[in-house]
Regions:
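Carbohydrate-binding surface patches
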Residues: 84-97
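Broad gene-expression machinery/nucleic-acid interaction feature
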Residues: 15-21, 32-34, 78-80, 89-91, ...
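Short beta-strand micro-motifs enriched in acidic
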Residues: 23-27, 84-86, 333-335
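Rossmann-like S-adenosyl-L-methionine
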Residues: 99-367
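Short, solvent-exposed loop/turn elements at beta->coil junctions and helix N-caps
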Residues: 5-13, 80-83, 124-129, 315-320
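Extended interfacial segments that mediate partner engagement and assembly in macromolecular machines
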Residues: 1-78
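Short small-residue beta-strand/loop micro-motif enriched in glycine and branched aliphatics
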Residues: 43-49, 90-93, 153
Length: 367
């Protein structure tokens, strides 16, 4: 258990979801196209005309968008629309299985003009997206007002769906790390730099490590855009096969590490936590942000029981109202490492060794 339970963080229960994936299906019996979420535990698409968890701008667009899709010749070849909205822009990514006709494209351009949106096309996988109007597409940005950082992202990039609570979460993580101007920090699973760039405004050096080479390249570009290139470095590494040697290498590269932030996907960070449990080169503070309480509990147990880390505090953030999901945050600092017993010669827990039992039998009287 943590020594302190942090106060939970709540945001608005409504209008919070800034990313969503809408399914599209023509329903002949209704003579129309449905655009919306799937019904609970069903392949059916809800007949949505509004949505209270989407920003009002997006909710108000559902009916006009549905009418637009219904008017397109390729409506049967457009199974999905992914959306991303910020204060500045609304991007709609159309999963198109066929090339658009000139008439369809003209309708999209008129809709884009009338409603102030940016259409993107996705002919294949998520990396294949491109804007319909590259010269005029508005850039999507996450803002961290306390540090002045802006993180630019593409509509299919992973970002937190709740932008306001993401900003609060980043601020809380910075404060829990107890950063100093001389701090050397590693941000594991750094993505586009959601934590890395704000961390760099309060530290001497931040190393962001991420599995995707493309995200690392764009995180570097983000650091340059925010005038933080001289305080940041980025590496593309597979963090699921991280070893103690890898930890030693980054420790030596930075000349020591004062703080660590871990923000893994649902799978957690077992290999990374194993190295932090085994090493004698330990940072002064570790903050672990998690979207999966089960893997956080597993990794925390590894750090505490095998590495001697102390769980100072932990808390939750209601990042996803009206769902069963929760975002958690935990703070650790080094404690005394447990003693390791390599070999027990005479007595084992729960009974005697085989050698001791044999000696006892040899001393029993013969009858």
């Amino acid at each position: 258990r943590p020594e302190q339970v942090l106060a939970p963080i709540y945001g608005s229960a409504w209008r919070y979801r800034h990313r969503a994936r809408l399914s599209v299906r023509e329903v002949a019996k209704k003579g129309t196209v449905l655009v919306g979420f799937h019904e609970k535990r069903s392949s059916f698409i809800a007949d949505m005309k509004s949505c209270e968890i989407l920003p009002k701008r997006v909710s108000d667009l559902l009916v006009p968008l549905r009418e637009l899709i219904n008017s397109l010749s390729l409506r049967k070849k457009l199974p999905q629309i992914e959306l991303a909205v910020t204060d500045e822009a609304l991007a709609l990514v159309l999963r198109v299985l066929e090339k658009l006709t000139a008439d369809d494209e003209a309708k999209l351009r008129q809709f884009q003009k009338d409603y102030g949106v940016d259409f993107w096309y996705q002919p294949k996988g998520p990396d294949s997206i491109y804007p319909m109007d590259p010269e005029n597409a508005t850039r999507l940005k996450l803002h961290h007002r306390e540090t002045g950082v802006e993180v630019v992202f593409r509509p299919t990039d992973f970002t937190q769906v709740n932008h306001r609570l993401n900003e609060v979460m980043v601020t809380r993580a910075l404060r829990l790390l107890h950063l100093e101007p001389s701090s050397k920090v590693i941000d594991f699973f750094c993505g586009l730099g959601n934590f890395t760039l704000p961390l760099a405004t309060r530290s001497a050096k931040v190393l962001g490590i991420e599995g995707s080479t493309e995200l690392v390249d764009r995180a570097r570009a983000g650091a340059k855009d925010n005038n933080l290139a001289d305080k940041t470095e980025f590496e593309a590494r597979n963090l699921f096969d991280w070893t103690l040697d890898d930890w030693d290498a980054v420790w030596n590269k930075l000349g020591g590490v004062d703080r660590v932030l871990i923000d893994p996907p649902r799978e957690g960070a077992m290999a990374l936590c194993r190295s932090l449990a085994d090493t004698d080169k330990r940072p002064a503070r570790l903050v672990y942000v998690s979207c999966n309480p089960a893997t956080l509990a597993r990794d925390a147990a590894l750090l505490v029981r095998e590495g001697g880390w102390k769980l100072l505090s932990a808390g939750v953030m209601n990042m996803f109202p009206h769902t069963a999901h929760v975002e958690s945050i935990a703070v650790f600092e080094p404690g005394p490492k447990p003693e390791k017993i390599d070999e027990i010669d005479e007595i084992e827990i729960g009974g005697m060794t085989e050698e001791a039992e044999q000696e006892t039998r040899s001393e029993e009287p013969k009858i």
